[in-house]
Amino acid sequence: MADVFESLELLFDRPNEPLITPKGENNSVFQLTEQFLTEDYANNGIELNNRFGDDASEKIPLKNLSKLPEFKIATQLPKDAEFSLFLPKHQEMANELLGVLMDVPENELQDLLSTCAFARVNLNPQLFNYCYSVALMHRRDTRKVRVKNFAEVFPSKFLDSQVFTQARETAAVIPPDVPRIPIIIPRDYTATDLEEEHRLAYWREDIGINLHHYHWHLVYPFTANDLSIVAKDRRGELFFYMHQQVIARFNCERLCNSLKRVKKFSNWREPIPEAYFPKLDSLTSSRGWPPRQSGMQWQDLNRAAEGLFVTIDEMERWRRNVEEAIATGTVRLPNGQTRPLDIDTLGNMLESSALSPNRELYGSIHNNGHSFTAYMHDPEHRYLEQFGVIADEATTMRDPFFYRWHAYIDDVFQKHKESAYVRPYTRSELENPGVQVRSVSVETPGGQPNTLNTFWMLSDVNLSRGLDFSDNGPVYARFTHLNYRHFSYRINVNNTGSSRRTTVRIFITPKFDERNVPWIFSDQRKMCIEMDRFVTVLNAGENNIVRQSTESSITIPFEQTFRDLSAQGNDPRRDELATFNYCGCGWPQHMLVPKGTEAGMPFQLFVMLSNYDLDRIDQDDGKQLTCVEASSFCGLKDKKYPDRRAMGFPFDRPSSSATSLQDFILPNMGLQDITIQLQNVTEPNPRNPPMSV
């Protein structure tokens, strides 16, 4: 019999299929009672369930609940509808369901299994999957339950819609024990290079990048009845920093592709020239995602079904109030009092999360911006159209307009950082007395000195867990993505003092702007992308620090982005892999390095060894934890953010004196010119399953 953790994991399997059918690779069947049957299966559900059970390798009994949970709001979402947290009505539904799942008494796991099974049977599969994932991450008794890879459970959110007809044919015709040829996904399936934004499709539509965004919002939801789920340490600041780094990385990629930095969307009444045709179909709704034509505009939203009533006038009023808060350095509270504005508060105001200090006054600018864009084609629900990809956390980064909108959001944060209420760093805050960086470099095995190399890779993703109503057995899709040759940082440091700890902060930045001229510091600081941050010990005298690119505190390993959960069932690292539920929101390892150019694009490597006395947090540093990957973007579970400095330090604010990055350098910092060169070759991923040929 499957243990309760394995049974909970099976609730992710084939989300659009009813629970009466077998789940998982072992053909496991939940033994349902009348309590768990919907009206559709009231007459023959038990008989069907028993028939499936005759062929099952294991049967999972479900405990009858003494009191059935009530879902007065959540049941209003049809099972074949799309779900979006940006919609007020859907937020209410999620809060109701999440509250029920969190309220099951701790360690009553059979009750939890039955409650979750009842919710899965009766509610929309996407709504259930989101709330179930958040609950598993935030309940103390389910930390060993692995949240399944969202791209494998809902593959239609990530892959060309044409794939699924071929996938069903493969599943139906080829026996599971026969090697199956992967279905090839073309690199250019959403547009051609006649559309200049398509040059960035490899980045915007990357499965790992979109999983990163979805997973980050699972770990940091902006709404819940239980505020402890939302109120994590420096949550609003992390919303700023994660998205600021996304925009900086996107702008680096634009320069690599001979495009200008993204233009912020600040005039909310002008036409939007960026079109997007996603070429995705939803397996939940059996409809295609709506495209956006060039030249469409935001319009007032009046959609009763989603509880979405908001006007552009309201958005502009909220913007004026936020601008006033930045200009005065104060936030007005509902009771009329004020308090100082800081970056964490501003993040919660702008998103806005349940922690917003005054939602009536400051509104929900970020979230409604997504909704305005997602409903331009049907703002009044006249044509019964669903939202566009920008309103789904798993698909939003595919849309070119996502970056224009977030360039505006980031600009608001930057105005705060540049205001009179955020002072530039003093020399004593930046320096590390007695520490001198003599040289910094990067080294790629077999490569040129101070040169990073990127290339294309073919990787497989298993579709079978999300391929409803088809035979078991793996069905692979093969897609092309960017990758890089692993490298090491080498830092030579002289420490004239005694042995001490230091935080090593590593960034890279393009050397020239889009006009091919050197940057001014006020612009270049916003283009600095964090590559790594770690604490190390400096001995007295000379120190040679070597750090592998794969150890980055920004990223999660490739295996965790595209992890095969079925293979982890008996893995001795099960607890460690389950902790991925939390830290899995990190940046994908294969996208750590910008693409560069075939000729080689000039970048600069910046390394800083900061004063640990000003960095340290009085808690365990996380090294005793099984999962410390991606702490820069994800924090540490149930702990404070592992760095006392402002996120993005030392580039999060202007300098009082430096006009260039070279001017900014102090003895405890190093700057080195490097080159990023694209090797325009495509290689198969050695991790691809052996049966894919």
From Swiss-Prot:
The GO biological-process annotations, alphabetized, read as: defense response; melanin biosynthetic process from tyrosine
Keywords annotated in UniProt: Copper, Disulfide bond, Glycoprotein, Melanin biosynthesis, Metal-binding, Monooxygenase, Oxidoreductase, Secreted, Zymogen
What is catalyzed by this enzyme? 2 L-dopa + O2 = 2 L-dopaquinone + 2 H2O; L-tyrosine + O2 = L-dopaquinone + H2O
Superkingdom of source: Eukaryota
Under Enzyme Commission nomenclature, its number is 1.14.18.1
Q: What does the PTM comment of the record read?
A: The N-terminus is blocked.
> Catalytic center at which residues?
E351 (proton acceptor)
Q: How is the cofactor bound?
A: Binds 2 copper ions per subunit.
Broad class of enzyme this protein falls into = oxidoreductase
Q: In which tissues is it expressed?
A: Synthesized by hemocytes and released into the hemolymph plasma.
Question: Got any disulfides in this one, which pairs?
Answer: C583-C627, C585-C634
Q: Which cofactor does it need?
A: Cu(2+)
Per UniProt, where does Cu cation B bind? Answer: H366, H370, H406
Can you tell me which residues are glycosylated? N26, N64, N462, N494, N680
Q: Name one GO molecular function term.
A: tyrosinase activity
Subunit text? Heterodimer.
User: What's this chain's function?
Assistant: This is a copper-containing oxidase that functions in the formation of pigments such as melanins and other polyphenolic compounds. Catalyzes the rate-limiting conversions of tyrosine to DOPA, DOPA to DOPA-quinone and possibly 5,6 dihydroxyindole to indole-5'6 quinone.
Q: Which family does it belong to?
A: Belongs to the tyrosinase family.
Q: What is this protein called?
A: Phenoloxidase subunit 2
